[in-house]
Amino acid sequence: MKRTFQPSTIKRARTHGFRARMATKNGRAVLSRRRAKGRARLAV
């Protein structure tokens, strides 16, 4: 059985990156929640 986690920086950024979050209304909600919580890193 192959390992399921095959890291790729590009895929990571495209699905969980800042610009990906900003692209949708819900993504912006995620960022605002993380800002409110005081996260050092908002997105990947």
UniProtKB/Swiss-Prot annotation:
Keyword tags: Ribonucleoprotein, Ribosomal protein
GO-annotated molecular function: structural constituent of ribosome
Any one GO CC term of the record: ribosome
One BP annotation, GO: translation
Gene3D superfamilies the UniProt entry points to: 1.10.287.3980
UniProt family annotation: Belongs to the bacterial ribosomal protein bL34 family.
Matches recorded under NCBIfam families: rpmH_bact
Name under which the protein is recorded: Large ribosomal subunit protein bL34
Lineage start: Bacteria, Pseudomonadati, Pseudomonadota, Gammaproteobacteria, Pseudomonadales
Name of the encoding gene: rpmH
